[in-house]
Structure formats: structure tokens, C-alpha cells
Amino acid sequence: MAALYRPGLRLNWHGLSPLGWPSCRSIQTLRVLSGDLGQLPTGIRDFVEHSARLCQPEGIHICDGTEAENTATLTLLEQQGLIRKLPKYNNCWLARTDPKDVARVESKTVIVTPSQRDTVPLPPGGARGQLGNWMSPADFQRAVDERFPGCMQGRTMYVLPFSMGPVGSPLSRIGVQLTDSAYVVASMRIMTRLGTPVLQALGDGDFVKCLHSVGQPLTGQGEPVSQWPCNPEKTLIGHVPDQREIISFGSGYGGNSLLGKKCFALRIASRLARDEGWLAEHMLILGITSPAGKKRYVAAAFPSACGKTNLAMMRPALPGWKVECVGDDIAWMRFDSEGRLRAINPENGFFGVAPGTSATTNPNAMATIQSNTIFTNVAETSDGGVYWEGIDQPLPPGVTVTSWLGKPWKPGDKEPCAHPNSRFCAPARQCPIMDPAWEAPEGVPIDAIIFGGRRPKGVPLVYEAFNWRHGVFVGSAMRSESTAAAEHKGKIIMHDPFAMRPFFGYNFGHYLEHWLSMEGRKGAQLPRIFHVNWFRRDEAGHFLWPGFGENARVLDWICRRLEGEDSARETPIGLVPKEGALDLSGLRAIDTTQLFSLPKDFWEQEVRDIRSYLTEQVNQDLPKEVLAELEALERRVHKM
């Protein structure tokens, strides 16, 4: 059968005979259900025709992105039993997936390059690497050959031209996704700019090729159409950065099937960024305006479950301060002609974790998801609404709950009503505090970059890096508390450098070199780098810092540091606020001594753990500048 990818060859989309494709099925026998293949740019038409020969769909639908098309897509999904209307809200829908298809599958997510070391550093002694999964071109070819021939039989192949970033922005990039999932079509219309305007902007330009199949062909054997289509045993998400291709099979869940998100916007884009001299990062972007009217833009990288969306949509507790959201998950950043680092949010929507979202933790998110939203794997209330752990809303009398598994549920039940990774997919424009410049084609100027993690002990509320090189080291050493899969293991501290550990598109050592190289750019105005930790606890296990809207007090100090205020003192790990420099007015008593303490025994162990991780996981690819920063920290901690 014809294969999408051939090892060692750039795929020839402009005529298949040189690669010796067997004839599968003439494209003329396929029904084009919507759109005109002949009007597509040559590169896209070749991509569609070859993929159709390979996957053998029943018909082809070229998406135009219109409201009428979206309505028809949602109606089709409802008729197939894949989504349910939520009458409590305006144009909101609920999808329930197969319980085996609920999250990103890191173990089945691979980067394909000729050399393993292009993708991942090689730990000493053949130890298992934790910084990505490499697959050889030959193995990947076999995997594609086993999965894709005929995989769309009985289904429609949708052609989705989409722009990551505002259409026409010099910072944006275009992709074309082929998929047999109408759920993906409806979700991608929210998460990206999708349709005819993208084709017009692309012309004959380059685009990232994205092929996705749920991996469950309908061969006329009486398969139930209401069952969530997926193929968990054969799930594979492959990235071929040299060819700018993404190939995903077997999963309908967001991170595996909405290929514009982590696959394109981080894994492929981080490689594009390295090749072209920019940055593609797992970061929120927010604008913050002081009471005096001074506005700054900040990018921040946090691992999962550390409040990235909450910070991006924060309602500041400090009077007179205003936060506006540019993006909550991904930042593409490039230096302009004047040396300013400018950032866009390449996404068009929010794909947020539902549990824990409430009017208390994130009122702006709750306002965003009242209309035009697709919910996945949350619970449903009998009055046509949604429900999840931490929604902080009492159930009205007589209202019952159906869990994400379709079973009756009541408060106090042992099992959660919503899956822990359940999601809302909502248009960004509906957020009440979207920044006026969130779609500015030139991007917004970044003044500070913040790293952070969930650290119950030892790490202070906020500190500033000494300089850019030290800041890159701080990002490389990021760690965060995570709940282990096995319950009895309790909480463990995981390394998550730059909050990018699952998303690197190339060797992390080379990624560090790329970040370090920014310092050598002529005229570059480098942002200051900070580290925050909202999650430190006292001996009794209580949080030392109230978090949420009170985090504006930390942003206030960061902004004053950017203005050159002398409000920091030097410590072995970085610059922390001087006594009284944080505005704590109106707060209950905060134990700042404990909040900013640096226990020597903790930091001695911390630097041992960081050294072990970097020397083992990055090994020979660890830049000498990062190793020098580690050694300098070791010396400073030794003198504490």
C-alpha cells in the first residue's frame, strides 16, 4: 500500500510515480462533498490526493470555516450520538470519549529524525531518556504502513486549512490538517483560524502537513456509529520535523487529534523556531497595567496543574491593577527590528482543564465558557448544565448529575463525576479580559519571562535571575510536584525544564544552546527572567500564600523591578524582594520569613538533584554555560 512517509526521502507530493506507489484507488472515484479540489493550491491538492489514495475515505469535504458549516458539523455529531446539546447554555455541547482515549499519550508520541541525537540527548550507559521519544525513519515507515492504508473507509476526509496566529501576521504559520473526525473539525474551528481566508493568505506558500485518523474505518459490518471512534492499541502520534509533517493515528482526544495545538505549536514550531531564530514556548502571555497606567507584557511557563490559565485570566486583588489576557498556553516570540522580543498567541481558543475551575479560582474562564463551547468528559446535570470537581456550585434541589462515564453520580461518591483531564474548548474572543492587542499581527512586546512550579518546600515565592544566562539555567532546573500514577507513591517532585518536557521538538541540549544564543543577538533587549512558587506550605501543610488574585502583588514587584526600583536583595539562588518590598496591604498576616527562607539542607539536596538530572539526561549535550551556572549555584549554596 502507498505510505505517507518514506525514510530518507522528502515526500514527493507532486507526482507519486517516482516513489513507486502502487495504485490504490483513483481520486476521480471519490465524491467531493464540499469545495473544489481544483481550486486548491497545488501543494495542498497533491497532499489531499495522495492521502485520499492512501486512506480511502468515502468522500472529501474542504472546510470553508463558515458559521453554516459549523452548524452542520455540530448537527451531524449530534445525530451520530457523539455530542449532546446542553440547553442550559447557548450553543454548548458535551462529548464523552472512550475511557481509553482521555489524554495525551506521551509513550506513543514520537519525533522522527535520521539521527536519534537530533531528537533526544543520549544518557550515559544506555539509561532511559525522559526528554522525548525518538523513532527511526524505518520503524516509523513500518508503523505508517501498518495503520493508514484504508483507515478512512466509510468516513469523510475533512480538509482543514488553518492558521496558527492571526491570518497574515509575519509571526503566524499555516497548516493543513486532514482528518476523519467531525469532532476535530468543530474543535479546530474554535482553536485555530480556519477556512477559506487561510487558503487565500497561503497561496503557493509552505505549510505544515497534518494527517489524522481515528483509526476505525467503517467497512459496512454494522459498526455502531454512536461509539466514540478510536483505536487505543494502535495509537501513534508522529512528528517529522525535517519535512514539517505530523501524522496521528488512533486517538480522537484533543492533544492527539487537534494537531495545531501541542504537535504543531510546540513540537514542530520549536524546531522551526530554532532553524529561523525565534522561540516557540509553553507559555501564557498577559498584559498588566499599573494604577499609574504603565502597561507591561509578561510571558510565563508553568507545568500542568500550576495555574497557568488562572494567572492569564487573573482578577487582581490589588486595587487599580488590571490584567488582560493575550493567551493562556502557547507563545511564539521573535525579536523585531528594534530588538524587542514580540509575542503572539498562535491559538484562537482555550482548551482548558475543567476540574478546579470556578467563579472563585477563575471567574473570567467561567464567563468565557457560557456559550459556543465544546465540553469533553465533564459531568452533566439534569437541567442541561455541566458539573465537575471544584466547580464550587451547589446543586439546586432536585437536580441530578450524570458522570462522564454516563452513570448516576452524587456528591460524596468515591469516583469523580468528571475525568481529571476533562476539558472545555471555547473561543478566546469570549473571554471578558482579552487584551486589545491579542490579535495584533506584530505581536506584543515581552518585558519579563516567568518560570514557576508547584514546590511545597524550600523555594521562595519569587526571585529574579541575576542575568539572561542564569535565567536560562533557572528554566532548565524547573521542577514541580506531581501526583504519581500509583496512588501509594503520593506526591513526587518531577523535573519539567521550561515546562516543555513533553513538547520538545528536538534535542533539549540544543534547545538550551538556542536560548543562550539570544544573548549574542545584536541590539536584543532581553526580557528579565523571574521564578515564582505560589504553592509553598508550612509545617502543618497549609499554603503560606493565598494565591489567585493575590498573585498580582508579585507581578507588582516584578513591574517595579522592570522600572529599575532598588527593591531586591541578593541571595544564593537569585534576587528576592527586600523586607517590606511586597505590597501586602489588606492581607491577613503573611509569614514572609518562612515564605522566603532558604534552608541550606534543602538547597544542598536541590542542587544535587539538578546536577544528577542535567548530567544524566542531557549528558554530553549540556551547554558549558549551563554547567557553569550549576557549579556557581553549588558554590553559593555551600557558603550559606
From Swiss-Prot:
Cysteines engaged in disulfide bonds, as pairs: none
Phosphothreonine: residues carrying this PTM: T42, T196
EC code(s) of this entry: 4.1.1.32
Compartments it resides in: Mitochondrion
Main location: mitochondrion
Metabolic or biological pathway, per its Swiss-Prot or TrEMBL entry: Carbohydrate biosynthesis; gluconeogenesis
Cofactor field: Mn(2+)
Residues found modified as N6-succinyllysine: K457
Annotated positions binding phosphoenolpyruvate: R104, G255, N421, R423
Transit peptide: 1-32
A biological-process GO annotation: cellular response to tumor necrosis factor
Residues given in the record as Mn(2+) binding sites: K262, H282, C306, D329
Disease: Mitochondrial phosphoenolpyruvate carboxykinase deficiency: Metabolic disorder resulting from impaired gluconeogenesis. It is a rare disease with less than 10 cases reported in the literature. Clinical characteristics include hypotonia, hepatomegaly, failure to thrive, lactic acidosis and hypoglycemia. Autopsy reveals fatty infiltration of both the liver and kidneys. The disorder is transmitted as an autosomal recessive trait.
NCBIfam families reported for this sequence: PRK04210.1
Binding partners and assembly: Monomer.
Protein name as it appears in the record: Phosphoenolpyruvate carboxykinase [GTP], mitochondrial
Organism phylogeny: Eukaryota, Metazoa, Chordata, Craniata, Vertebrata
